[in-house]
Structures are given as structure tokens and as C-alpha cells.
């Protein structure tokens, strides 16, 4: 897939120069792959002066790889754009992004017009995620992934965020600089297979929610208080029935109630544990990544 990607992006570089008066170069981030990815990047870097690459010592995840690419690029760039190597996002949208950056915008988001290339399940889960984030007062852009262009000062401001639990879609929006939007049609995947399965998507969603909102903790508190209130009412009801000489029967309802309460407690502990785990990771302040090789 990478040779195909290189060809498409080489054409884009020429168009950026002629249509947006912008010189560009490519930086590929190899996120600890075990196939021929780094070999292809190295050969491309030797053959083309506008191509370079970094190979991370181990897999840092999608957000970590994006961070590494921006941090490695910002010192020698007036603007930095990020795009996945499968080029399902329309790379030509970067021409309009560059124009807006040249006109004074600091962050230009690539926004999908539709989600026709997705399965119904992915459309449903994505839309549910965006709606959930919006209900929690998160400022992420609807139908925007991580396809964007940022000015140097925006990237430098982003680099000041110290957290290791990265959710760039949320962090970038909080920078507050001048924004622009470019709308594009996302392509169906032409080559290769997705390496972002459902398990990773769910983990990413949970990470995004817990990185930018304490709403799950507030919800647990609300559920706990509600159950306490219901329990008090039931206790009063039981006492009154006992005084009247009536015994409340129903082992089935008792067992169901116990299982229900046990499930809520376990879930609450799990959600609380996620937040505690995030604190644990942040407190250690480990390095974000290590570069094993450069090309």
C-alpha cells in the first residue's frame, strides 16, 4: 500500500506548490510495525528528498504516533497536516487547508460530508459516540477524525499539554485558535486491510469519554443516590408491613435485586478504576515515545 500512497502524495505535493503556493514534505511514522513498512519508508527516503520517516521503538497507538509525527515535524515547518496512510481521507482536501492556513487560520479540520463508505454498524456506533460526547459538553467536531492541518503556533501550543492519555480530537479543539473547515467525501478503502478492529475502536471511545468528561462518575453517583432513596422507601414500606402483621415474601425478587445491585457496584468499580488507572499513568510521566531509527 505504501508505494501507492507515496505516488498519490507526490502528486499532492506538486499541486500544493502550484495551487496553494506551499512547499511540502512527507514524514511517515512507523508505529512499531513488524512487516516491511520501515524498509519501504527507508527506500523512499533515499530515493526522494521530500520523504523522511521515523520508526518508533514499539507500538504507541494511533494517537501516540500522531503526536510523535507532529512533534518531530513542527520545528522545521510552518504548518503540519496529519493523514492516515490508507488515504481514505481525500488528500487533495489539504490544498484548501493550506489556503486557509495561508489566510490566517491556525487549525483547519477535515470533515466528512457523509459516511456512505462505512458499514451500518460503524455508522451507528460513530454517530452514537459523537452524540454521547456532545451530551457531555465535549467540543469535538462532528464527523472529524484526525485529518487536519495546524499552524506551527497551534502545534507548539498542543505540545504543552502534558497528559499521556491522548485524545487529540478533544485537545486540539480546546486550543481556541482560529478554525477553518474543509468538507470532503471519504473514499472506500482501495488497498490493504484495516488494522483498527472493533476492540480498538471501543477502547478509543472509552478513552475519549474518560479523558474529557467526569460525566460517568457523576452518573454513578446519581444511580447510587437513586438506589439509596429507593432502598429507604422499601425499608419504610417493609417496616410498616411488619407492624401491620404482614410478611413480604419473594425470594426470587430478593435474588434479582441482589444480582442487580451487585452488577451496578461492579460496573461502578470498573468506571472508577478507569479513572484511577489514568491518574496512575499520568503520575508516572513516562516518555511518550522513543525513535528507534530515522530515514
Predicted segment positions?
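Non-catalytic, surface-exposed connector residues within folded enzymatic/regulatory domains
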Residues: 3, 20, 118-119, 141-144, ...
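Acceptor/aglycone-binding surface of glycosyltransferases and processive sugar-polymer synthases
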Residues: 52-58, 62-72, 91-166, 187-202, ...
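Regular, well-ordered alpha-helical segments
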Residues: 11-14, 99, 134, 281, ...
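Residue-level signature of catalytic and energy-coupling elements of molecular machines
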Residues: 9, 69, 86, 108, ...
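A ubiquitous structural signal for well-ordered alpha-helices
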Residues: 5-8, 12, 40, 69, ...
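Structured catalytic core of nucleotide-sugar glycosyltransferases
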Residues: 1-119
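Hydrophobic helical membrane-anchoring modules
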Residues: 167-295
Amino acid at each position: 500500500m505504501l508505494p501507492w500512497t507515496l505516488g498519490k502524495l507526490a502528486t499532492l505535493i506538486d499541486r500544493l506548490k502550484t495551487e496553494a503556493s506551499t512547499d511540502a514534505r512527507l514524514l511517515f511514522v512507523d508505529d512499531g510495525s513488524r512487516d516491511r513498512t520501515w524498509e519501504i519508508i527507508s527506500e523512499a527516503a533515499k530515493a526522494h528528498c521530500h520523504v523522511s520517516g521515523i520508526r518508533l521503538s514499539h507500538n504507541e497507538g494511533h494517537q501516540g504516533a500522531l503526536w510523535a509525527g507532529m512533534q518531530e515535524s513542527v520545528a522545521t515547518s510552518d504548518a503540519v497536516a496529519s493523514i492516515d496512510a490508507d488515504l481514505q481521507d481525500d488528500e487533495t482536501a489539504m490544498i484548501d487547508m493550506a489556503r486557509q492556513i495561508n489566510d490566517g487560520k491556525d487549525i483547519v479540520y477535515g470533515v466528512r460530508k457523509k459516511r456512505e463508505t462505512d458499514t451500518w454498524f460503524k455508522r451507528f456506533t460513530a454517530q452514537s459516540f459523537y452524540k454521547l460526547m456532545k451530551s457531555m459538553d465535549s467540543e469535538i467536531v462532528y464527523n472529524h477524525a484526525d485529518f487536519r492541518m495546524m499552524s506551527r503556533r497551534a502545534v507548539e501550543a498542543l505540545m504543552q499539554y502534558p497528559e499521556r492519555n491522548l485524545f487529540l480530537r478533544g485537545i486540539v479543539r480546546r486550543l481556541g485558535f482560529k478554525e477553518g473547515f474543509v468538507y470532503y467525501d471519504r473514499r472506500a478503502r482501495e488497498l490493504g486491510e484495516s488494522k483498527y478492529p472493533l476492540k480498538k475502536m471501543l477502547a478509543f471511545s472509552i478513552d475519549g469519554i474518560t479523558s474529557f468528561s467526569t460525566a460517568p462518575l457523576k452518573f454513578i453517583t446519581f444511580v447510587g443516590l437513586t438506589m439509596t432513596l429507593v432502598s429507604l422507601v422499601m425499608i419504610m414500606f417493609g417496616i410498616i408491613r411488619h407492624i401491620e402483621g404482614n410478611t413480604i415474601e419473594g425470594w426470587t425478587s430478593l435474588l434479582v435485586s441482589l444480582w442487580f445491585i451487585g452488577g451496578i457496584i461492579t460496573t461502578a468499580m470498573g468506571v472508577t478504576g478507569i479513572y484511577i488507572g489514568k491518574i496512575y499513568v499520568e503520575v508516572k510521566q513516562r516518555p511518550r515515545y522513543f525513535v528507534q531509527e530515522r530515514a
